[in-house]
Regions:
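NAD(P)-binding Rossmann-fold cofactor-contacting core
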Residues: 1-5, 116, 121, 130-147
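N-terminal beta-loop-helix "entrance" segment that forms/cooperates
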Residues: 1-15
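Short acidic low-complexity segments
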Residues: 13-24, 140-153
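Short glycine-/small-residue-rich Rossmann-like dinucleotide-binding loops
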Residues: 32-33, 52-53, 161-165
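Glycine/serine-rich phosphate-binding loop and adjoining beta1-alpha1 elements at the start
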Residues: 34-111
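Rossmann-like adenosine-cofactor binding region
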Residues: 142-184
Length: 184
């Protein structure tokens, strides 16, 4: 992981094992449970914890229930009203922006950016965008109409919204795409 040898993890107290051995343990920590392809290999009574996003991912929820697993969803863990992984969410926003600009081959300065969302991920995205000189406007659910009106002026749109699965529409439609600036 991250080009760090297993020995380095062992020096810090970790037990490194095969996937097969890990899946026999009572508790499995997987930060990206939503991407898990091994749930069918788990046994009734085992526990998994990480970013489950069960509400947004019915297939994962179904597998957890069918296999009699317990799940602890990090996205549902709060202490005194604050998400316990708030800084992780902020870092996710920062990293996503950096990665997107790297893929695009442009630098954020001289770009106009719309950030949709008001949570920690949006906060991280906005922080790094400001640090790199972008012009940023933030929108929320209550300003969706304004966002759609102003959409054509943006070079970049960063979506940091945890989607309401009951909604059947889209924030940006195919028609909206026709009015956006062309990418490179």
């Amino acid at each position: 992981i991250l080009q760090i040898e297993d020995d380095e993890f062992v020096k810090c107290g970790a037990h490194v094992c095969s996937r097969e051995e890990a899946l026999t343990k009572d508790i499995i920590c997987d930060p990206k449970v939503g991407d898990a392809e091994y749930l069918e290999q788990m046994n009734e009574g085992q526990t998994i914890f990480g970013w489950v996003h069960a509400t947004q991912n019915y297939d994962i929820t179904e597998k957890i229930v069918q296999h009699g697993l317990s799940a602890y969803a990090w996205e549902s863990m709060y202490e005194k009203g604050r998400h316990i992984f708030w800084r992780n969410n902020e870092l996710a926003g920062e990293a996503a922006v950096l990665h997107a600009y790297q893929c695009w081959g442009e630098m954020p300065y001289r770009t106009k950016v719309a950030v949709i969302g008001r949570g920690n991920t949006a906060g991280g995205a906005i922080k790094i965008l400001h640090m790199l000189g972008a012009s940023v406007r933030q929108y929320s659910r209550s300003t969706e109409e304004l966002f759609k009106e102003e959409l054509p002026m943006f070079d970049v749109v960063v979506n940091c919204v945890l989607w309401d699965v009951k909604r059947k529409d889209h924030i940006i439609t195919k028609e909206d795409l026709k009015h956006m600036k062309k990418g490179h």
